[in-house]
Every structure is written in structure tokens, then in C-alpha cells.
A protein has these predicted regions:
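N-terminal beta1-alpha1 ligand-phosphate binding loop
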Residues: 5-19
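A short beta-strand-loop structural module common to alpha/beta enzyme folds
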Residues: 29-42
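Catalytic phosphate/metal-binding cores of nucleic-acid and nucleotide-processing enzymes, i.e., regions
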Residues: 12, 116-119
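N-terminal beta-loop-helix "entrance" segment that forms/cooperates
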Residues: 40-57
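Conserved small/polar residues in nucleotide/adenosyl-binding loops
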Residues: 126-132
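Conserved TIR/SEFIR loop-to-helix hotspot centered on a Trp-containing motif
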Residues: 87-99
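A short helix->loop->beta-strand "cap" motif at the edges of active sites that frequently abuts
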Residues: 103-107
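TIR-domain catalytic/interaction hotspot
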Residues: 56-79
Length: 136
């Protein structure tokens, strides 16, 4: 049986690739899915619905399109891994963790020790929390 693992969180490091490479070396049967990780593509997801003069409406349309993908992939996953980075506010990661909890999906959180306190509520339902990415 292949595991369907949803990778959520910050997009500014190669943590997803590290996990994929590590589990491939171990021969684990995993299929990975993720939100759109290219920032420009994510921001432009709703552009095919028409050009907007106001960025609010561009963001609104793109977020609606992106949310269809995110919700569907979280609902279909066996487990999620949510990485909270130390840069930028991690709204999407926190929201995805909340969706996992609401949908009854087990999830693992990854984050650095420096942000343990601000994440205490966001990770309170997690099944496992790791301070760093641990690969064999």
C-alpha cells in the first residue's frame, strides 16, 4: 500500500526535497502531494478568470482556486507533514494544520526551536512534533 502524504508549509527552503530523498533511500512507498510551491504561480492561480485592477480581488480569486486544491489533497491524504519556517508569517501552514485537525487527519509538524512558543496552540493537536527534519 502506498501512503499518500501531503506536504504543507513554507516554500523558501528545500525541506520537501529532503523528505522525498530520505524516504526514497529507505524504499518507503509514499506518494507526495503539496500545495502550489511556486509563489508566482500560486498568486496567479485565478488570473484565467479575468484581470483585476484591485489586488484584493486578484488575491481573492487565486485563493479560492488554490483552496480547492488544498482542501481536496488534505482530504485525500493519509497523513500530512506541516513545516513552519522561521521567516514570514506562516498563515497557510497554520491553516492547513487546523484543517488536518478538523478533518481528523494525522499530521506531523516540523519547526525550529525558536518558534516553539508561538506555535503552541497551532501544534496542540499534532501527532508528532519535530524540531528539525530528521533523515536517515
Amino acid at each position: 500500500m502506498d501512503w499518500n502524504v501531503y506536504l504543507s508549509g513554507e516554500i523558501h527552503t528545500d525541506w520537501r526535497e529532503q523528505i522525498k530523498e530520505g524516504t526514497k533511500k529507505l524504499g518507503l512507498p509514499i506518494i507526495y502531494t503539496s500545495a502550489v510551491t511556486d509563489h508566482e504561480s500560486s498568486d496567479a492561480a485565478g488570473d484565467h478568470l479575468g484581470v483585476e485592477e484591485n489586488n484584493f480581488w486578484r488575491d481573492h480569486k487565486s485563493s479560492k482556486i488554490n483552496s480547492i486544491r488544498t482542501k481536496t489533497l488534505i482530504e485525500k491524504c493519509d497523513i500530512a507533514i506541516v513545516r513552519f519556517g522561521d521567516k514570514f508569517k506562516q498563515w497557510n501552514a497554520a491553516f492547513d494544520a487546523g484543517c488536518c485537525a478538523a478533518f481528523g487527519k494525522p499530521y506531523i509538524t516540523l519547526h525550529d526551536e525558536e518558534i516553539i512558543h508561538p506555535l503552541k496552540e497551532a501544534v496542540s493537536y499534532t501527532h508528532l512534533t519535530l524540531p528539525t527534519i530528521l533523515l536517515v
